[in-house]
Amino acid sequence: MKSARTSRAWIKAHINDNFVRKANHEGYRSRAAYKLQEIAERDALFSPGMTVVDLGASPGSWSQVALESVGPTGKVFALDMLDMQSLPGATFIQGDFRENGVLAALEKVLDGKRADLVISDMSPNLTGIRVSDQAHGMYLAELALMFCREHLNPGENFLVKVFQGSDFEAFRQLMQADFAKVVIRKPKASRDRSKELYLLGLEKII
């Protein structure tokens, strides 16, 4: 009974969420679009003609923002283990980023070129066990960072979702070895009770 009450409370809060209503009105697939928009505007992440890789893309709101920002001369490559309704201008790969074959498929569509921006909103299947969820989230963030080491152009940027916890500082130090500057972002569209943060690596060193 408690879980049913919790579900009803979540649904009510979701329906009354200003960002949810705004996303529905403006045609974005989720409220997450405004997280990326806020960070992108603050830190000037996008420019026309960029090649963007969007990890954990489904349902596609970050890819929508990326497509709007890079324009017709840009490219957006989206990846998620969940299906995503097609977006004109975006190339979507469905699969688990942890599997070598899926990574190889992404490398194939990149066709030997590197990205100008990597954005990752990947999240594990949350269990409610904070320590476990945080550890799995950090593992996905580390995979995204490893991808950047090989496939992000020097001097370019990397935005990744992480969860506050015991491994947070260690992961930030990993990023600091690869980027000239690493900053923390908590956009307004990120719910107050959420432990999620975003780390932004600016100007990849190598």
From Swiss-Prot:
GO terms for molecular function: rRNA (uridine-2'-O-)-methyltransferase activity. Pfam families: FtsJ. S-adenosyl-L-methionine binds at residues 60, 62, 80, 96, 121. This is Ribosomal RNA large subunit methyltransferase E. Coiled coil: none annotated. It catalyses: uridine(2552) in 23S rRNA + S-adenosyl-L-methionine = 2'-O-methyluridine(2552) in 23S rRNA + S-adenosyl-L-homocysteine + H(+). It comes from Nitrosomonas eutropha (strain DSM 101675 / C91 / Nm57). Keywords: Cytoplasm, Methyltransferase, rRNA processing, S-adenosyl-L-methionine, Transferase. It is found in: Cytoplasm. One of its GO terms (cellular component) is cytoplasm. InterPro entries: RNA_methyltr_RlmE, RNA_MeTrfase_FtsJ_dom, rRNA-MeTfrase_E, SAM-dependent_MTases_sf. Its main location: cytoplasm. Signal peptide: none annotated. Belongs to the class I-like SAM-binding methyltransferase superfamily. RNA methyltransferase RlmE family. The active site is at residue 161. It comes from the Bacteria. Its EC number is 2.1.1.166. Specifically methylates the uridine in position 2552 of 23S rRNA at the 2'-O position of the ribose in the fully assembled 50S ribosomal subunit.
